[in-house]
Amino acid sequence: MYVVIMGGGRVGLTLANLLISDGHDVTLIENEETLCANAAVELDALVICGNGTDIKTLEEANISNADVFVAATGNDEANLLSCILVREYSIPKIIARVSNPDHEEAFKKVGIDHVISPERTAAGYLEKLITRPKVADLIVLGHGDAEILDMEIRSSKVVGKRVGDVSPTDKYIIVAIYNNGDLIIPQPDMVLERGTKVSVLVKTDAVKEATRRFTG
C-alpha cells in the first residue's frame, strides 16, 4: 500500500514509522525545514520538504498513485485545502486530522472519507484506520480513552509467563497473539515467548506503562 502523509510532527512521523514497519510505502510531506530534516534522518522513506497545499508538491509525491492520503498537520485550514486538492486525484481513502471539533462539519461537507477528531489522533489509531479499518472501530472507546497497541514481547517481566498471569489488568488486556502471521485468540494457559507479537487493548493513560511492561 502506498500512503502519502502531510505533516511531519509527532502524529505524522509516528504514523509513518508504524506504516513503514508494517511494510508499506510512505512519502511524507513537511514544509518546516527542521521537522523535514528530522524526518529525513528518521524515516526509511521519501521525505519532501514542501507545502502539501501545493499541487506541484503533491505531484512530486506521486499522489495519483497513492492508496491513502493523510492530512496530519495541526493546521485545520491546511489539512482541509490539501484534502480538497487530493480529491481531484480520486484517491481511494482520504483521512484528515482535525484539531478543532467545530471544523469537522466543513471536512464532511466536502466529502472527506474520515475526519479524525483530537481524541482519535493517536498514530496507532490512524495506522489501524489505514491498514485494518475494522480493528480501528474497536480502538477508541467512549471518549477516546483506549487504543490497541501492537507490540513484540521483549521484557523479562512477561517472557515465560502465562497469558492469564499477565492479562487482564485494570489497565490493559491482551486481545490477540500472532504466530507466523496467524492471529490466535489468547488463552489463559498460553506461554508468552520472547519475540511473540501481541495486540493489547490499553487505556490511553496507561500506554507508556503497558509498553514498558511488554517491551522493556
UniProtKB/Swiss-Prot annotation:
GO terms for cellular component: plasma membrane. The gene is trkA. InterPro entries: K_uptake_TrkA, NAD(P)-bd_dom_sf, RCK_C, RCK_C_sf, RCK_N, Trk_Ktr_HKT_K-transport. It holds the Pfam family TrkA_C. The keyword Lipid metabolism does not apply. Residues 1-116 form the RCK N-terminal domain. Part of a potassium transport system. One of its GO terms (molecular function) is potassium ion transmembrane transporter activity. Keywords: Ion transport, NAD, Potassium, Potassium transport, Transport. This is Trk system potassium uptake protein TrkA homolog. SUPFAM superfamilies: NAD(P)-binding Rossmann-fold domains, TrkA C-terminal domain-like. NAD(+) binds at residues 7-11, 30, 73-74, 97. Residues 136-216 form the RCK C-terminal domain. The RCK N-terminal domain binds NAD and possibly other effectors. This is expected to cause a conformation change that regulates potassium transport. It comes from the Archaea.
